[in-house]
Structures are given as C-alpha cells and as structure tokens.
Amino acid sequence: MFLMYLLVQTTESSWLSKTYKKLENSAKKRISEGVAIAILGGLRHRRSVAHQEEASLHVKTDELPSPDTVREQL
C-alpha cells in the first residue's frame, strides 16, 4: 500500500523533492551570507568551528609547552 502511495505521488510533492529544495535553499542562503560579508568586510561566522576559533584566540605563544617538555611527557 505504501509503495503505491509513493508511486502515485508526483515528483513536485514527494518527500525527496521537498528535502532537496530545503537543502538547496540552505546552501543558497549560506553562499549569499558569505558574499554579503565579503563585500561589506568583516569576519565570516563559521557555524561548526566557532568554539575552536574562540579557544585558539585565547592561547598565547609564551604559554605553549616547549618541545623538550612534550618529549618528557611522552
């Protein structure tokens, strides 16, 4: 029964088509945001690595361990 339902549905109203359109719109939105930020200047907000960037900004070079200390710990 479910298979017949899937076959009867048109491609415009199918779940796969709707999902594809959502992904396409999301990609278009991210691209347009990146272009706008590039034109206006400024940092681009990265969704997946934001916490890493914040953490790396607080590290100072004088706080990093020396290579000898790292070898001793190994």
From Swiss-Prot:
UniProt region (Disordered), positions on chain: 51-74
**Which UniProt key words apply to this protein?**
Antibiotic, Antimicrobial, Secreted, Signal
> Which stretch is the leader sequence?
1-13
Propeptide stretches in the record: 45-74
Induction per UniProt is: By bacterial infection.
Q: In which tissues is it expressed?
A: Expressed in the body wall, intestine, uterus and ovary.
Report which superkingdom the organism of origin falls in. Eukaryota
Cell compartment(s), UniProt = Secreted
Q: Has the keyword NAD been applied to this entry?
A: no
List, alphabetically, the GO terms of the cellular component aspect. extracellular region
Q: A GO biological process this protein is involved in? A: defense response to bacterium
Family membership: Belongs to the cecropin family.
Q: What does this protein do?
A: Has antibacterial activity against several Gram-positive and Gram-negative bacteria. Is weakly active against yeasts. Acts by a nonpore mechanism.
This chain's protein is named Cecropin-P4
What is the scientific name of the source organism? Ascaris suum (Pig roundworm)
